[in-house]
């Protein structure tokens, strides 16, 4: 079991690197499951929320919306609990059953407010499948961090100085290593 961890400040390119790695894995015949939660902006470039997307089926729904009424809030964003919980549960269940590699972008305060995410994340972290994990740079949850770091890890902290190089070399490096792990 091995975790590839991507972290860094907001806007540095973590999701770009994650997507690059996932696409490179897929092109090499490796089955990737999991979730990603990209931000959504309106026509003026103003962030209005976050989607949750199943990496295997591409099904998507709202994770959180700006000024959305919800019992669970993170800053100005209300969690769309029913929709996000359903997609998270199904995406991570399928990833555990059918994928060679599990990807999650990201493990952060917003996602961790969702009970289903915490429950499924624990199952993912206990799985022996290789994982590509984007971790919020301020994540301080000891129970989650302990589970992430109890196995072999490669951690990459993205900066302005290394992101271009990492986008060039890391996806292929990970493909070669994962092919050895899963014997594909």
UniProtKB/Swiss-Prot annotation:
One of its GO terms (molecular function) is ribonucleoside triphosphate phosphatase activity. It comes from the Archaea. Its EC number is 3.6.1.15. The keyword Isomerase does not apply. ATP binds at residues 8-15, 101-108. Keywords: ATP-binding, Hydrolase, Nucleotide-binding. InterPro entries: Nuc-triphosphatase_THEP1, P-loop_NTPase. It catalyses: a ribonucleoside 5'-triphosphate + H2O = a ribonucleoside 5'-diphosphate + phosphate + H(+). CDD domains: RecA-like_Thep1. Has nucleotide phosphatase activity towards ATP, GTP, CTP, TTP and UTP. May hydrolyze nucleoside diphosphates with lower efficiency. Belongs to the THEP1 NTPase family. This is Nucleoside-triphosphatase THEP1.
């Amino acid at each position: 079991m091995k975790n590839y961890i991507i972290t860094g400040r907001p806007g540095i390119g973590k999701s770009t690197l994650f997507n690059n790695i996932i696409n490179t894995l897929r092109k090499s015949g490796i089955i990737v499951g999991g979730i990603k939660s990209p931000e959504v902006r309106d026509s003026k470039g103003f962030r209005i929320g976050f989607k949750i997307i199943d990496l295997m089926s591409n099904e998507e729904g709202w994770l959180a919306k700006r000024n959305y009424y919800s019992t669970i809030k993170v800053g100005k964003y209300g969690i769309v609990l029913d929709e996000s919980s359903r997609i998270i549960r199904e995406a991570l269940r399928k990833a555990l059953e059918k994928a060679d590699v599990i990807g999650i972008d990201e493990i952060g305060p917003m996602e961790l407010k969702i009970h289903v995410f915490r429950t499924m994340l624990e199952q993912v972290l206990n799985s022996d499948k290789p994982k590509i994990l984007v971790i919020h740079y301020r994540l301080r949850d000891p129970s989650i961090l302990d589970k992430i770091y109890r196995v072999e890890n490669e951690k990459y902290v993205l900066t302005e100085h290394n992101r271009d190089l990492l986008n060039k070399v890391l996806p292929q490096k990970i493909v070669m290593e994962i092919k050895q792990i899963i014997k594909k």
